Amino acid sequence: MNNALGLVETKGLVGAIEAADAMVKSANVQLVGYEKIGSGLVTVMVRGDVGAVKAAVDAGSAAASVVGEVKSCHVIPRPHSDVEAILPKSA
């Protein structure tokens, strides 16, 4: 696992796609995947160095808020290796 995990949660798929696009374009991060939470909520996840993930989450959150609603965003620096078990298998 890389040094950080970044998450942006949006209301609707369009905002999630916009966030994912902005995140990977704005910083050197890898797209981990997305999760449909329910009630229209979608969470997009990226990995990379702490600084890159922070920049990506900021960019993704800003981009998603233009086309939709951002519910939450968070960066987990140095997540525990057990977190790997709950990430999408494509990671």
Curated annotation (Swiss-Prot):
Keyword set, alphabetical order: Bacterial microcompartment, Transport
Biotech and industrial use: Artificial BMCs can be made in E.coli by expressing pduA-pduB/B'-pduT-pduU-pduN-pduJ-pduK (in this order). Enzymes can be targeted to the BMC, and appear to be encapsulated within it.
Domain BMC: 4-88
Deletion phenotype: Cells lacking this gene are defective in aerobic degradation of propanediol. Most cells lack BMCs, 22% have highly elongated internal structures, 20% have amorphous polar bodies. Grows in an interrupted manner on 1,2-PD and vitamin B12; grows for a while then stops, then restarts as if a toxic compound was accumulating and then decreases. Grows faster under limiting vitamin B12 conditions, forms elongated BMCs. A double pduJ-pduK strain grows in an interrupted manner on 1,2-PD and vitamin B12; grows for a while then stops, then restarts as toxic propionaldehyde accumulates and then decreases.
Other notes: Bacterial microcompartments (BMC) 100-200 nm in cross section are formed during aerobic growth on minimal 1,2-PD-B12 or anaerobic growth on 1,2-PD-tetrathionate medium, but not during aerobic growth on glucose, anerobic growth on glucose or pyruvate-tetrathionate. BMCs can constitute up to 10% of total cell protein.
Any one biological process term the GO annotation gives: propanediol catabolic process
Name of the featured protein: Bacterial microcompartment shell protein PduJ
Species the sequence originates in: Salmonella typhimurium (strain LT2 / SGSC1412 / ATCC 700720)
